[in-house]
């Protein structure tokens, strides 16, 4: 919570009161992408750290029959949900201090988009933590997010992505979040921006901004649904990987041979007892 408030105040100090000129367009885009990037790292990496530390302990306890894999995994998912409250605080502070679209519906869409991104980032972290050793997961996590950042929509135009790498955008939760946030912010027909008049590039309205980044066909609802579908698929994959990790350990099955004491005593006659005592 503390770090989220610090980041929110930092963004507020840098982007506070963005204008409706061309610099304001650039600042809005930069702030939106930084929000996506911050939420990606702050959601995925803690998920990797926490689960990787518990992984071996959980697998051993499951092998001993302490609890089922599904019970642990569901409890882990539920335990991660309260952490979203700090993201609500972060996004609310940034949204109103920076001065994004004041429409309440746009604000609610903004919250929905960032929550879906956080869930997808947590799912990415769970996949890495369950499918890789601890050291590899901690190293591969930031590298994976960096690749997703390149295809997020601001550093590389979606229309210029090579054909062989276009599939990355379909599994890139940062792209889904950033494109949806841009559509939410600049998709308003009343969004207009002033031009400097110095002969440079001018983006007079939100439609021109979306077209520049190849987001003109992007809508919020489909992007949110894609994020939810991606999250569900990644969580299922993480669960399968956890089950496979658990199967490497032989379940502990202690078979105790405990015949009834009364039957043993009844099977021993008094004569047998006396005979054993005479032999002694």
Task: State each model region's role.
Residues 1-279:
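Membrane-spanning alpha-helical segments of multipass transporters and channels
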């Amino acid at each position: 919570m503390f770090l989220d408030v610090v980041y929110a105040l930092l963004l507020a100090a840098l982007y506070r009161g963005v204008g409706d000129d061309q610099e304001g367009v650039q600042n809005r885009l930069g702030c939106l992408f930084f929000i996506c990037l911050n939420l990606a790292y702050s959601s995925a990496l803690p998920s990797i750290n926490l689960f990787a530390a518990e992984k071996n302990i959980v697998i051993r306890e499951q092998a001993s029959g302490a609890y089922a894999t599904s019970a642990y995994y569901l409890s882990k998912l539920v335990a991660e949900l309260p952490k979203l409250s700090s993201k609500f605080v972060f996004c609310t502070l940034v949204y109103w201090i920076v001065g994004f679209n004041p429409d309440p519906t746009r604000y609610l869409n903004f919250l929905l988009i960032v929550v879906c991104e956080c869930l997808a980032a947590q799912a990415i972290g769970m996949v890495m933590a369950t499918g890789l050793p601890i050291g590899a997961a901690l190293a591969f996590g930031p590298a994976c997010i960096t690749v997703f950042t390149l295809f997020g929509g601001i550093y590389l135009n979606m229309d210029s992505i090579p054909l062989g790498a276009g599939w990355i955008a379909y599994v890139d939760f940062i792209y889904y979040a950033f494109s949806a946030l841009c559509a939410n912010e600049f998709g308003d027909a009343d969004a207009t921006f002033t031009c400097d008049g110095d002969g440079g590039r001018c983006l007079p309205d939100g439609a021109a901004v979306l077209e520049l980044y190849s987001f003109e066909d992007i809508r919020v609802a489909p992007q949110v649904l894609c994020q939810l579908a991606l999250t569900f698929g990644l969580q299922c994959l993480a669960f399968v990987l956890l089950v496979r990790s658990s199967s490497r350990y032989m379940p502990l099955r202690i078979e105790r041979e405990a015949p009834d004491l009364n039957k043993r005593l009844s099977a021993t006659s008094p004569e047998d007892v006396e005979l054993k005592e005479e032999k002694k």
